[in-house]
């Protein structure tokens, strides 16, 4: 049975998995659990199958500085890194996390990514129902 876990502190036992982030390892772990940020883990039985880091913003970020802003009234959930340990878990992670945010944060009305400009990211997001919103200098925003 799959279970979505929210991680809001580096003291959480699942925070240890942040070291495995292959997409944005340079973002400090404490930033990922700050006021406008949440890390989510998808567990299948007791095994972690996927992780995603989400930043809540008041705009769709086009660069890392905009992603790191701390707005007072966020309306956009930005999925900025996702990785999985099991085939197919990334898709489940995105869908489960979006549902959780919709149910728990009604002020969040847009769901986008801040993705690297890679073919793997493009295929992943388009295959899972996103559309290309904007291509930036060093990233792409996909909209769910």
Task: Indicate residue ranges for each PLM-predicted region.
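Hydrophobic transmembrane signal anchors and adjacent membrane-proximal interface regions, especially
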Residues: 3-7, 95, 132
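Short secondary-structure junctions
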Residues: 29, 129-136
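Non-catalytic substrate-recognition and accessory regions of acyl/acetyltransferase enzymes
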Residues: 1-74, 83, 106-112, 138-144
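Acyl-donor binding region in acyl/amide transferases
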Residues: 65-129
């Amino acid at each position: 049975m799959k279970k979505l876990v929210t991680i809001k502190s580096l003291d959480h036992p699942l925070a240890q998995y942040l070291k495995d982030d292959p997409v944005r390892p340079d973002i400090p772990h404490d930033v990922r659990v700050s006021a406008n940020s949440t890390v989510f883990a998808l567990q299948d039985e007791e095994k972690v199958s996927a992780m995603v880091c989400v930043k809540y913003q008041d705009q769709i970020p086009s660069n890392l500085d905009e992603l790191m802003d701390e707005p007072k009234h966020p309306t956009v959930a930005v999925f900025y890194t996702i990785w999985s340990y099991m085939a197919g878990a990334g898709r489940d992670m995105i869908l489960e996390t979006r549902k959780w945010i919709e149910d728990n944060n009604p002020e969040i009305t847009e769901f986008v990514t801040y993705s690297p400009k890679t073919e793997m990211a493009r295929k992943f997001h388009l295959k899972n129902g996103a559309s290309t919103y904007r291509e930036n200098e060093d990233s792409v925003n996909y909209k769910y």
